[in-house]
A protein has these predicted regions:
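Conserved alpha/beta-hydrolase
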Residues: 1-13
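Primarily recognizes the serine-hydrolase "nucleophile elbow" in alpha/beta-hydrolase
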Residues: 33-92
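Short, proline-enriched alpha-helix->beta-strand connector loops that line the catalytic pocket
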Residues: 117, 127-134, 205-209
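Active-site loop signature of alpha/beta-hydrolase-fold enzymes
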Residues: 9-11, 79, 219
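C-terminal catalytic histidine-bearing segment of alpha/beta-hydrolase fold enzymes
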Residues: 137, 143-146, 153-231
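Short, solvent-exposed loop/turn and secondary-structure capping segments
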Residues: 15-18, 59-60, 82-86, 146-152, ...
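Alpha/beta-hydrolase active-site loop
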Residues: 18-38
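Mobile cap/lid helix-loop segments that gate and shape the active-site cleft of serine hydrolases
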Residues: 69-70, 76-77, 81-128, 181-193
Length: 231
């Protein structure tokens, strides 16, 4: 097994960070390096990350050049523009960092750049689902405390966006009713089993795309995440 953990462009508070084209190129370059210098089975390349790493995982799925077997995004960010409003309303430090990474001036968000850096607004490469899997994992309590800063609606809206771009049947979507129940009840909506030692609150799957909500916060269940990638 070859494990690479590139730093990309550092903390997400500069114009070159926050899933810029340079970050996407860094991900591709890191994989290229591993292929050249490691004993790599190119049919078994995986990308995973938590939080900002989950954001990068979604960006990699949308734009990276390699044929990846599986992407797993844990508690990811998908919409930088909307997250600015969410973090500003909650007076979290991230709102100031978003201004920095979007070249914003005078405390006003440069929305054009924020959208450019948001997978939510990118074209979906639907053909990738012919050979790649994308799983999104969401802690049901995320977005409720300062140390759990990304609302679950970020993942829900991105999941539904992919379905829309794939012209999926309406039954595949997470409905507004389910979204409201997840936000209100913060507990399993049925018997969906467990991941690791956590109850699954809700799960949805369409072809090679899946989303799982579990009892937890802004976290990755590391052993489960590794084992699931290796399947």
């Amino acid at each position: 097994i070859n494990y690479i953990h590139p730093d990309f462009r550092g903390v997400n508070n500069t114009k070159n960070a926050c899933c810029s084209e340079l970050v996407i190129a860094d991900i591709d370059a890191a994989i290229d390096y591993a292929i050249v210098h490691g004993n790599v089975d190119t049919s078994k390349i995986y990308v995973t990350g938590r939080s900002g790493g989950g954001y990068a995982t979604l960006a990699s799925f949308m734009k990276a050049k390699h044929k990846i077997k599986k992407f797993a995004a844990w508690v990811p960010l998908a919409d930088l523009a909307k997250w600015y409003d969410q973090t500003k309303a909650r007076k979290l430090k991230y709102s100031a960092e978003i201004l920095l990474c979007t070249s914003s001036l005078n405390g006003e968000l440069n929305k054009e750049v924020a959208i450019e850096k948001s997978p939510m607004y990118w074209k979906t490469p639907a053909e990738k689902f012919d050979y790649s899997m994308l799983d999104i994992y969401v802690g049901i309590y995320d977005g409720l405390e300062s140390n759990s800063p990304i609302p679950i609606t970020q993942s829900i809206n991105f999941y539904n966006k992919l379905l829309q771009d794939m012209a999926a049947d309406s039954s595949a979507y997470i409905t507004d009713s389910v979204k409201l129940k997840l936000l209100e009840y913060e507990k399993p909506l049925g018997d969906y089993g467990k991941i690791a030692d956590r109850d699954i609150c809700f799960v949805k799957k369409y072809k090679n795309l899946g989303i799982t909500f579990f009892t937890g916060g802004h976290e990755m269940l590391q052993q489960f995440a590794f084992d699931e990638l290796m399947k």
